[in-house]
Amino acid sequence: MSLEAFHHSEPLTLGVELELQLVSTNDYDLAPYAEDMLRIMKKVPLPGSVVPEMTNSMIEISTGVCHSSSEVLGQLTQIRDALVKSADKLNIAVVGGGTHPFQQWHERRIYDKPRFQELSQLYGYLSKQFTIFGQHVHIGCPDADSALLMLHRMSRYIPHFIALSASSPYVQAQDTQFDSARLNSVFAFPLSGRAPCVLTWSEFEQYFNKMTRTGVVKSMKDFYWDIRPKPEYGTIEIRVFDTPLTIERAAALAGYVQSLAAWFLAEQPFTPTEDDYLVYTYNRFQACRFGLDAVYVDPASGDHMPLRDHILQTLDHVARYAGTHGASGALHMLRGETALGQNDARWLRERQREEQLLAEVSRQAALRFRGHDI
């Protein structure tokens, strides 16, 4: 199968996908209600889409094409409000977060869709363990070569995205000591990690063709990279975010991506090289493990610094581009919470310290997703 041509898209436009938990309001464990939710949601006119995911206790929502983080928030608000109403009819709740804090993976059931069934046959128990919940952000690129440059420039900021979105400290009722344990499940897949460092579409086509000849890859969907090109949309797709507990944070993260992308296109600040990836896995681990308290190694200079400081410096650097694209409020929110070391993983741990019951933490997270200020 040949690689699809890179389609035209408006540069710097956004699209956001969120994978969400469906939980019972009796015990706040995951509940297999995806099919019922989708049946109800089909009747509601909404922007974007609501679709099934790998197991039947999760769904994915997505926006349409948006021009700003405020437009993302507007669309997510419409979809969220409709989800909440539908869930209330079924006596279930919808929750954000990168992992459910105490579900048992072996109890999950694969959603009845051919691709999910094929993946289950291929990956065995990993498929059920893939009941994890991420946010994906698409950013429009001017052309195919620009998309690859954008992808590899964004790779330097993967630790930012992980730490700012981290919301998966608990797995099977245990505190993993990771802020983002979700990504540990992704690492198990053979085609995860990072894209090859090629900077032209013709080189990327050659790589793709080699991979398809091996029989390992049939389409771009087979790559579980942290960032991958989406030629059918004319975008790159950043896939390392945990699903935040609120749609406000999800929209703010999209605003940060857009501000970075605007800086890259306007200033072409550096040319990515293979050496950028010497510290990639280390930086990624640090962000997953320690969140905003991680260490960041600058790939260009080799300097070590607190990740929090690097995020704050970058937020300042892209502030004028945020202003141009209506993302100043989004970056202001991220700046304030970064300065305090506050991400969703910390919020979840604080609730657990207070409540000593993960079901109650999940209940409060459901209220937070609804828009309650707790």
UniProtKB/Swiss-Prot annotation:
Keyword Nucleotide-binding tagged: yes
| InterPro entries in the cross-refs | GCL_type2/YbdK_subfam, GCS2, Gln_synth/guanido_kin_cat_dom, YbdK
The Gene Ontology biological process annotation of the record reads: modified amino acid biosynthetic process
| GO MF term list | ATP binding; glutamate-cysteine ligase activity
Among Gene3D superfamilies, the record links this protein to: 3.30.590.20
Describe the family membership recorded for this protein in Swiss-Prot or TrEMBL: Belongs to the glutamate--cysteine ligase type 2 family. YbdK subfamily.
Instruction: List the protein's name.
Output: Putative glutamate--cysteine ligase 2
